[in-house]
Amino acid sequence: MDTMTAEGLLLPWPDDDGEPFWEHARRGELRIQACADCGRLRFPPRPCCPQCGSFDDEWRLMSGRGRLWSYVVAHPPLLPAYAELAPYPVALVELEEDPRIRLVGTLTNSVRRPGAPWNAVPPGRLRIGAPVQAVFQVLTPEVTVVRWALCSG
């Protein structure tokens, strides 16, 4: 598996527990690991439920809706490919289904533009609590990443 895109961006390197997350993302689905016994959602994926200790899990389909819980604006100096995109916001999003589940990703300015440049959302538009929607950007035939589209309202 490649470690970088043709543009020099780092690709995710999933472990065994996280591979299903990336597999579902390739299909355009946001799925989160859940305990098959007690139902607790967990992210990042891990082998054992932190609530009941069960090793049985399932991957539940999420709505993709969430809220901006926090963000940071990345500035140079960074790796060369990232420096060319900076400054750009990186979001921490809490999912609508469970606010304890938070995912990191870059933002896009429209659900219709999953491949928009990372700096497409001006940092001045960002507000904690702003609604976002998951979108999926294909980076390589093997890797699709979850990004977050800033929603109006």
List the predicted regions and their residue ranges:
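A broadly conserved sequence feature marking short terminus-proximal activation segments
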Residues: 1-30, 143
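Glycine-rich active-site loops that engage anionic ligands at enzyme catalytic sites
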Residues: 69-123
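Short, cysteine/histidine-rich loop/knuckle motifs that typically chelate Zn2+
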Residues: 34-37, 48-54
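Well-ordered alpha/beta subsegment
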Residues: 3, 100, 104-153
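Residues located in well-ordered beta-strands
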Residues: 34, 65-67, 92, 106, ...
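Short functional micro-motifs and their immediate structural scaffolds
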Residues: 43, 56-58
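Residues immediately within or flanking Cys/His clusters that coordinate Zn2+
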Residues: 29-32, 45-46
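A short, structured loop/turn motif at beta-sheet edges
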Residues: 60-65, 96-98
